Amino acid sequence: MPLNRRKFLSKSAATGAGVALAGAVAAPAAQAAPAASATAGQKPENPGKRYSLTVMGTTDLHGHVFNWDYFKDGEYSDAAGNAQGLARVSTLIDQVRKEKGRENTLLLDAGDTIQGTPLTYYYAKVDPITAKRGPVHPMAKAMNAIGYDAVALGNHEFNYGIETLRKFEEQCDFPLLGANAVDHKTQKPAFPPYFMKKFHAPGAAPVTVAVLGLTNPGIAIWDKAYVQGKLDFPGLEEQAAKWVPKLRSMGADVVIVSAHSGTSGTSSYGDQLPYVEDAAANIARQVPGIDAILVGHAHKEIAELKVVNDKTGKTVVLSEPLCYAERLSLFDIELVFVKGQWEVESVSASLRNANTVADDPKITKLLSDQHAEVVKYVNQVVGQATVTLTTVDARYKDAPIIDLINKVQEDVVKAALAGTQYAALPVVSQASPFSRTSEIPAGKVTIRDLSSLYVYDNTLVAKLMTGAQLRAYLEYSAEYFVQTAAGATVDVNKLTNAGGRPDYNYDYVSGLQYDIDIAQPAGSRIKNLTFNGAALDDAQEFVMAVNNYRANGGGAFPHVASAKELWAESTEIRTRIAEWVTAKGVLDPKDFASLDWKLTRNGTPVF
């Protein structure tokens, strides 16, 4: 479904801004050129005329509209004193507009908008926006009310499928940009690649600003089930090199890139794709003609990063606001009118903190009913727990709460394969310690408790693996631990995340027994690997229950992405856990806990 241009252009006209918008497949970029040529056709005024533009940016909102923790059922708080949510950042945005003059500001986002909280899950799956006479997505409501100008697509926009994304797009009063999200057959943009807007400069030609939106190539892996054969996601660098010159030729005085891509120049998916995952700094270095880049995806806080372009020697300014609307990036751009055209004289970036202001009552009132509906949903009781289960030490000790995930996955896969040629094969399962703070308290168990355990909307896949492949899989997973010599002090805060690997890329594997010797170098850590009490047979076949992220190559674990797929489903693993607990009625570790692995040093247990 293309962008609703009538609604978008009507909004632009109401603010007095002329807009050239390219990118819907039906409208080639060349058609937008006449709209931009008006700048060149105006009579130049006095050289030295100046104009100040402020571009505001958020990123990785992940469905956070209020400063509320749905998993804790209360106001969000952390040790750093952060505050979250669009209602909070809306107040910051209003402050900036009053300071700078709304007519001199632009508001952007760098993606990952419609996934990440029970709120976004609810309006994708429980009361879906795609239903006949379905609701308006709360993120669309909030961002429309705040007045976003353009938003880049994030990879999590595709988590619920293209139909949900297109419906969200239809509900937005702003374009969803993705120059490198192209139709598989035609290789033409499937979403608007860019957005252009003119700003009135008294006594001089208008200032034309172009925003190029770029999403993440990893979507081809992470949401393969939804996009394969429909959409392709080429590299950010090559697409920026294609589009930035076009935008300049169309009269853009300022070019901003909104990129759902970090700055590290690395990829979590290894060499599975020829495109870099975190390529924002690469774009700045390699592609001439960019003034600033709003960075997303990495969930890092970068007030200002200056990168020198290799070809022009000019400095490009990058900024990444902290996720969940905890920060607002500001790019202050100074222009001077010289020889009949606007030139960027300077760009600086800074951050504003959402914890310095109160919620915007306009947004609170707008979304209070939808928020209340979700709070009611997540507090439904589904069972009783005999003891408290927690992930506090699940990174370095085999924790029953993670065993619960694996037990559910094993049971679902066994039932799915019953009566097939694979029914007799042993089933093993992988699960990761997603959260360090998840807790299922003794007593009543709610959907909220289980959602805090499994925070992602992953689904279940069954893969055919050999013993040798599982051994390699475990060795790769064990690289998560920092090598620690026997006798050295063990600091659990420094024991994990070696090489920057996140917790979600460390896997337990149930059904096998093994030691991880952290005194050994990476690649030689798995010891005493057994199955049913005997040494693992490298040739034996297993069914491995994995989440779809891992099955598609997420985390670059060996063999699993290329392994034969035996079965898959669209029901979320979180839902399967809730169903399992509901059916049991009682959550008792004796029904799922098993000691499968432990950390050792030269054979001696660490704990």
Each predicted region: which residue ranges?
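C-terminal segment of classical bacterial N-terminal signal peptides
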Residues: 22-29
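Glycine-rich phosphate/diphosphate-binding loops and the adjacent beta-loop-alpha structural elements
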Residues: 380-398
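Acidic, Ser/Thr/Pro-rich beta/coil linker or hinge segments at domain junctions
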Residues: 358-362, 384-385
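Alpha-helical structural context
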Residues: 286-287, 388, 412, 416
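N-terminal accessory/precursor segments of enzymes
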Residues: 213-225, 347-351, 368, 372, ...
